[in-house]
């Protein structure tokens, strides 16, 4: 089952925003940022989504711009010994969706501009 989490972003006068919320667990499958039609986050805004307990960075996107976008984030995988898993033909890393182990997530915005707004959608399944 896929869960849709909606985060309404509203920066303060210094361009910052932060909120923390629980997640039951799953994988971060996709995210989408939609700017407000009249007061979008600044072009140089940074979005971070981090595990509140582990500090694991699920999203770290800088200078997001002022148009809507969607991403399907993936993390590099490794074998049981910790060596990078690579595709044999190309040597490119094998990637997979990051697992969220039932911890709280913190969404932070930096450099967002004075009292700017937008919406971040997270699909976790």
Task: Label every PLM stretch briefly.
Residues 1-125:
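Surface-exposed, low-hydrophobicity beta-strand/loop segments enriched in small/polar/acidic residues
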């Amino acid at each position: 089952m896929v869960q849709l989490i909606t985060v309404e972003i509203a920066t303060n006068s210094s361009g910052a925003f932060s909120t923390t919320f629980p997640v039951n667990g799953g994988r971060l499958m996709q995210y989408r940022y939609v700017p407000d039609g009249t007061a979008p986050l600044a072009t140089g805004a940074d979005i971070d989504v981090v595990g509140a307990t582990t500090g694991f960075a699920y999203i770290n996107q800088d200078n997001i711009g002022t148009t809507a976008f969607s991403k399907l984030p993936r993390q590099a995988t490794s074998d049981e010994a910790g060596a990078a898993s690579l595709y044999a033909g190309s040597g490119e890393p094998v990637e997979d969706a990051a697992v969220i182990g039932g911890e709280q997530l913190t969404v932070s915005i930096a450099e967002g501009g004075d009292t700017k707004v937008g919406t971040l959608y997270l699909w976790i399944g």
